[in-house]
Structures are given as C-alpha cells and as structure tokens.
Amino acid sequence: LSGGYREWLLHHFEELNAEEVRRYDRQMILPQVGSEGQKKLKNSSVLIVGAGGLGSPAALYLAGAGVGTIGIMDADTVSISNLQRQIIHNMETEYVNKAESAKLSLQKLNDRIEIKAYPHALTVDNAEEIISKYDFIIDAVDNFETKFLINDVCVLLEKAFCHAGILQFEGQVMTYVPGNNPCYRCVFEEVPESGSIPNCSQAGII
C-alpha cells in the first residue's frame, strides 16, 4: 500500500484520527477487528457494575481497547486488602470510592475516551435508567441480589450482558444475548439463601 498501512487507514476511515490509528493499530491489524471494528468500539458504551477483582481488569482492557464510553459503578471504598487483586486501584486511592478511583486510573490509561463514575450502588430505583444508557453491561458484583437485578433489567430492556463470579481459585462466566440464549435467572432461578455461600472475605480469593 502506497504511503504505508497507517496512511491508508487515515485516508479511508476519517472517523479514526492519527493518534487513534497509532494507538490501536496492533489490534486493527487483526482481520476480526480492522478499522470497522475499531470504529464500533469507539462508538460503543459499556457499563461495569463493580470495580473489584472482576471489574478492574475488565475496565482496564476495555479502556485500552478504545471503547468510547465506559461507566463504572461501585458504592464501596478502596481498602488495602483489595490491592492484591483489584489492580485498577493503588495506595494513593485507599479510602477513595472505587468508582472514582477506577476513573482516575482509566483516564491515565486512555484520556481520549469518556469515563463515567457512579459512586453508588445499583438499585431497583436507578437500574433501568442507568442500564438503558449503555450498549453492553458487565456484572462484576459480589452479591446475588444485584446479579439478579442486572439480569432482570437487561432482559426487560433487551440488553446483552456478561455475568462473572469468582471465589478462591474458581471462576464462572456467562454471556446473555437477547433472543439467543438463556438468561442468568433461567439458569439459577432465584437468589441463594442468605449465608449459604461464603463470600471472598470468608473463603479467600486469588
């Protein structure tokens, strides 16, 4: 290609500026991504509910990949016991709200995307309004009530979402695509009885 790969992309795809081509060209080389895929990432939005051990790497990689709008929600604050696995936080943000701490890290990684922090919990009162603003939802929370809430609202709004859970050395992940596969409630039916499943502070986590 005359002028090189980057120049060809800039000429044919004006929605991606020169800096974006330099930043993302390693993944744009992949035929499964390309310039069209990168433009889709740029114009997409993802809400991550939970900025802990699951939400941390998810948020970092989505920001690095160039997802145009990332919302991150968490009512908790950073504690030193989080830092062993919640890599989006650091000692400087100890005692800071996790959503706000995550926003600081993501802005340092990629200041060309929009980061929205929600320093509060997802509730029955706000879930539909917030979730409706995003293309894709990531359930990275550590309580079953919120997992079922995310599922039910996403099913209602026909939003695709990814559920994930971790405990000790094990993990679980499933993706719901409206009209394509069973939802979280279809598989697990109802919230487990309180105290029947230990949490990370009781059972441990890597």
Model-found features: residue ranges?
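Adenine nucleotide-associated cytosolic modules
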Residues: 2-206
